[in-house]
Each structure stands twice: as structure tokens, then as C-alpha cells.
Amino acid sequence: MRKYDKIIIGAGLYGLYSALFCCRRGQNVIVLECDSTPFRRATYINQARVHQGYHYPRSISTAMKSAGYFERFNKDYAFCVNKEFDQIYATSAEYSWSNGKQFKEFCKAANIPCEELHPGNYFKDGMCDGVFRTREYTYDAMILKDYFMEELAKYPNSVEIKYGVDIRSIDKDTDAFVVHTADGGAYQSGFVLNATYAGTNQILDMVGYEKFGIKYELCEISAM
């Protein structure tokens, strides 16, 4: 059984960022990924936007926190960010919990920019009661992936990434976790980072921890 300073489950943005963070501090890390390559799921699907909190009108504190991370992400990873387009938000005139006036007030309170536009410029009359030009960007997930893989390659003795991993169980005793995989592998560490995003509850359930109340929705995003 191999022992590590950190076991990271998931090779998306959070997983590889964490692995690089640990390697730079001299720690021995293994990343376990179920897919055949990194950045195959949420990190790739969510590249449609580097969001600034506009979709959190129910929580100003969350929006403000998102805005702070928006600035940090664009500073740290400017090499993969595309800013050359308009990002338009609209509030529906029907069946919406937020209207145009509320959205505008929310943006002002959260200190995030929005420019009010005429709804008829983008939508049929009566469909939307508010349309706004905002400041959000997209990023190229493949460029970002290549960056992390190149940086991690500088630490061949500190990091190991295993692909196609099927985690079957996780044992926990007083001071360590043991992750068991379908191929008979066993990996031990006092620290396990669950960076699986949509698979978070599957991992929590294996350890016997309380699961999050997550609602899953099937989404399709077109980035042009």
C-alpha cells in the first residue's frame, strides 16, 4: 500500500490546482481521476463563462465573493481568458423570481457592473422585462489544462496522476484514510481532498459523512 501526504480525487481545475499547490510545498501527492484525461467534466463544461456572481441574486454575499475570485482568476490565468464579446443577462417577464428592477438593484448592491439595454434589441416584445450588458468572460479549458500539466511535470518525484480509476471504497481510522480502487489498488493518506464536483456525495457516502443536499440538472451550453 502506497502512502502519500495528500490524496486528491478528481483531475479538474480544483484537483490539479491543489496538486500543484502541494507539490510546490514539497508534499507527495497522488491524483485519482475516473476519466482517461484531465479536465473532462465540470472544468470543461463550465468554460462558457468566468462568472462574476450575476446568477446569485438570492445571495449578495455569494455574488460579492464570486466577484473577488473573478478578478483573481483573470489575473492568474489571463493567458487562457477571452474577453472579446458581450455577455448579456435577461430577466423573464413571466415565471421569474427576479425582475429587471430587482436585478439592477442587486448588481448595485454587489458592486458588479451592469448596463441596462432595451429588451427589444435581443428578444421578442413582452418576453423579458430587463436586459443587461455585464462583465464576464470565457476561458479555454485546453490551454488551462496544458498549463497545469506542464507545471506538474516539473515535480515528477512529488506527484502521480492515475486515470481510469474506479474508487470502490474508502476506509477511515483515527489518523488516516485508505482509498481502495477496482484494480486492487490501495492508497493511504491522512488527508483526502474531494475535488469531484458533481460526484461529491458519492465520495462522502463512502466515508460515512453527511451528504450535501444537491439538486442535479441536465444542461447543454453552447459557447460561440
Model region roles, listed by residue range:
Residues 47-122, 127-130:
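Dinucleotide-binding Rossmann-like beta1-alpha1 core, especially the glycine-rich loop
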Residues 27-29, 114, 192:
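Hydrophobic anchor at the start of a short beta-strand
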Residues 23-44:
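Glycine-rich FAD pyrophosphate-binding loop
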Residues 132-191, 195-202:
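Helical element adjacent to the flavin cofactor pocket in flavoenzyme catalytic cores
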Residues 39, 185-224:
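Central helical "cap/lid" subdomain
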Residues 1-14, 30:
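Beta1/beta-strand and adjacent pyrophosphate-binding region of the FAD-binding site
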